[in-house]
Amino acid sequence: MNNLLELSNEQLTSSLSKMILSASGWRTIFAKSGEEQDNTTEITDALAGISLLIGKSFCDWFSKEFSQIKNKRIVLACDTRPTGKTIADYVLRSVIASGFDIRYVGVASAPEIMAYARKLDGFIYISASHNPIGHNGIKFGLNDGGVIDGEKSKVLIESFKNLCNQDDASEIAKNLFSSCNQDLLNEVYQKTEFYKKECLQSYSEFFYEITAASKDDGIIKPIFSSIKKSIKENPISVACDLNGSARCLSIDSKIFAENEIPFFTINDEAFKIAHEIIPEPENLIYCADFMKKLHSEGNNSVKLGYMPDCDGDRGNIVYWSDDENQPKILKAQEVFSLSVLSELAFMDYLADKFPQFKSEKKAISVNDPTSMRIEEIAKCFNVEVHRAEVGEANVVNLARELRNQNYQVRILGEGSNGGTITNPAAVRDPINTIFALLKLLCLKDEVLPNGKIVLGLFHRWCKFSGNESLYRENFTLDDVTKTLPKYITTGVSEPRAILHIQNSNHSDLKSKYQKNFEKFWQEKKSYLFDQYGISSWQAVCNNGTKQTNSLTDFSVSARGGLKIIFYNEEKNPISFIWMRGSGTESAFRVMCDVKVLDNSEISLTKATEFEKELLEYHSNLIKLSDSI
């Protein structure tokens, strides 16, 4: 425990300058050494002071924003990063000193604390999501189940900066540390186990509501009975590489046991992070190898696997390919596509059985670099696709805006990272993704007592997408993936998806990019038409929840997402290129999405090559614009 006696204003402002502050979270390297791969629990005096001021900033903002709430009940938790509990102690002291009713649950996954916060007034969560182990950060939220929105976040960030830059900032931090009532602090720690149990119970109840799209036991029980019945007839087990994450101490094992689904785990001791945290293909290999091992031992029912990140809100999928007799790692865009397919089919299935689920206006909310395959899937269910800027908060807030316009928004998320958010949740959750796939595999055709035939989810999709000839009763996930719209899309963790630029003025950079792109178009348009049938383009930008089409001035996208959509002669979109500076990392992200024009191997090869070529053109134009 740091005593902060030597803490200075200069140390605070220096640490502040290294922080990334955005609606998605406030992040920096908290490890005392400053090394991002350091697994120490220690932090510097400056970061201890920053942690105290973070707690005060949130409490001051909350008190002003919600002055009508007298007994302000806040839940605090952390993931399993080594510095998490250290930071939590300083935040606790600050919140107690501010007079709030604070409930500390220790380690919890992000979806877990956000489910619990729905019964309270807000939350503070200590996590740096998928970033390396030496990083850590803070997320803030209210009782609506998600992080605070962009506008509120701006106010809070400004308040925090002002506090850190005050002449007496270091003295404020020291006073917060020393003025905390030790008896109250001890009492908070003593109640941790009790509140953790409450937290888990809230999360478990919320899981069933999310999966069945209802709080009504008359709907929940038949849905889960159908899943159990199907799994009994065609056994399915699930494997998970928990990688020492917060999900080691969450509801996963309980939920699978309650639904009679065998659950196999590795790296299931909290805090023992075995490998890199980000759940992208290079780290999903451990789950894939575990599934191979299980099959070699005779556990042939293991069909699905997943690996969460450290805070347990993001997790991508491995499935057992019966066609190839080996595990296959799904790409993030494929995971999101399957989740969207399943949940849209599920809502249509429910509407066939229960009239309250019928809706004339249906939509999904996605981020701007989500592959266009989502539009093709949604169109089959008469569902509109609306796009927001990258950032979970933006996608969640867009969904709220759509619901205020009387849209039914069942699913939302960011295809670029595979994260699935299923209403009424407002945060990604891998267990919801797994159960979306289980519903897709298990909810099959049934005959109602009145004789009406209700198509299962996959059969429904095959019919609506014009692929009914591909449906068979004993289908596998291989069969499902064969029916997905085919696209080649840059992976978010690929080295070529990240550029490092010098120009911090993104409006200026994009203005220069526009001139270079327009010149490129004049020089290459005949070639692009000959190579891939591209005949026109449209620029689109996404800032927060707002999308601007037919953009004539690229600079107005500022620090938001900028996308060029390419069209064929029939005015159908067939590819896009995209760019945006990261709000949480020092990186400039780029990607390309290309439609495979038909099911032939030639078309697949051509699309694969064209995606590489188009992304290289795009990246070179950005680099050229940065050098001017």
Predicted feature descriptions by range:
Residues 1-49, 53:
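Cofactor-/ligand-binding subdomain signature composed of acidic, glycine-rich
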Residues 68-135, 252-319:
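N-terminal small/polar loop signature for handling phosphorylated ligands or for N-terminal nucleophile
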Residues 7-19, 29, 134-297, 347, ...:
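Gly/Ser/Thr-enriched, mixed-charge loops and adjacent short helices
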Residues 304, 325-328, 346, 351-593, ...:
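Phosphate-binding and adjacent anionic-ligand microenvironments
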Residues 72-79, 237-242, 591-593:
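Short glycine-rich or small-residue beta-strand-to-loop segments that form or flank ligand, phosphate
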Residues 123-129, 241, 306-310, 412-413, ...:
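Short beta-strand segments
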Residues 52-74, 217-234:
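Glycine-rich phosphate/diphosphate-binding loops that line cofactor/substrate pockets in enzymes
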